[in-house]
């Protein structure tokens, strides 16, 4: 095509297309003529609801550059869907349970007490800073997990708002435990014959659906794996 001035292979699996400057000039001229509200707008979606879930960082520390990239990318996808007539819901999935949260709380508690951070804990400077804030703002009865969770989530919200990235829904993984959604999902899987027990654990028959091996949903100690709330989350959405 005339607007492509070059094509080159860049490493295994990558092809770069170089666009002509004239193409960008032509597009900008079209935008000026059509107006920013009318250009490239369509009713393709006809109001169909679409959920775009993105960023979804663990509330165990500040967002990093990779999260920022994901935020911009996800928000761009949401804007494109909206532009094409879809009813878009932007959702942030909060990973607020599990081992990473326990390690985060243990790290914060260790710093507050003046003890070394556990080897598998979080060692960033922010843990030191937040521990100092926690000592200054709270008393000994304060739960480090709940305080740290609120601190991290507040930092996430502030960082995303500074990028003009806003969410319609902040979905807590813990909420599915409180609501019984995980138990209800597991019961539905049992009723469908999609799970079985082996070695004290509950396994998903995922090989029946093209997976290379069956996956553990509930470990032998009764603790759900990361996959179990993911299944419940998708069931909630469908």
Regions from the PLM with identified roles:
Residues 1-238:
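NTP-dependent nucleotidyl-transfer catalytic core
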């Amino acid at each position: 095509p005339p607007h492509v001035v070059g094509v080159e292979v860049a490493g295994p699996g990558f092809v770069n297309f170089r666009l002509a400057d004239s193409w960008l000039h032509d597009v900008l001229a079209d935008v000026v003529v059509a107006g920013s509200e009318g250009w490239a707008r369509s009713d393709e979606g006809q109001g169909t609801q679409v959920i775009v879930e993105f960023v979804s960082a663990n509330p165990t520390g500040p967002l990093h550059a990779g999260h920022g990239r994901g935020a911009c990318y996800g928000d761009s996808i949401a804007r494109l869907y909206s532009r094409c007539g879809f009813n878009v819901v932007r959702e942030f999935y909060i990973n607020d349970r599990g081992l990473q949260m326990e390690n985060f709380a243990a790290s914060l508690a260790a710093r507050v007490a003046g003890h070394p951070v556990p080897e598998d804990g979080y060692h960033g400077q922010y843990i030191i800073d937040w521990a100092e804030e926690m000592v200054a703002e709270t008393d000994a009865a304060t739960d480090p997990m709940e305080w740290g969770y609120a601190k991290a989530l507040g930092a996430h919200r502030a960082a995303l708002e500074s990028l003009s990235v806003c969410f319609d829904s902040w979905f807590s993984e813990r909420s599915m435990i409180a609501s019984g959604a995980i138990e209800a999902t597991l019961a539905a899987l049992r009723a469908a014959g999609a799970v079985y027990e082996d070695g004290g654990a509950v396994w998903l028959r995922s090989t029946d659906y093209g997976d290379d091996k069956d996956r553990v949903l509930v470990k032998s100690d009764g603790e759900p794996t990361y996959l179990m709330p993911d299944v419940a989350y998708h069931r909630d959405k469908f």
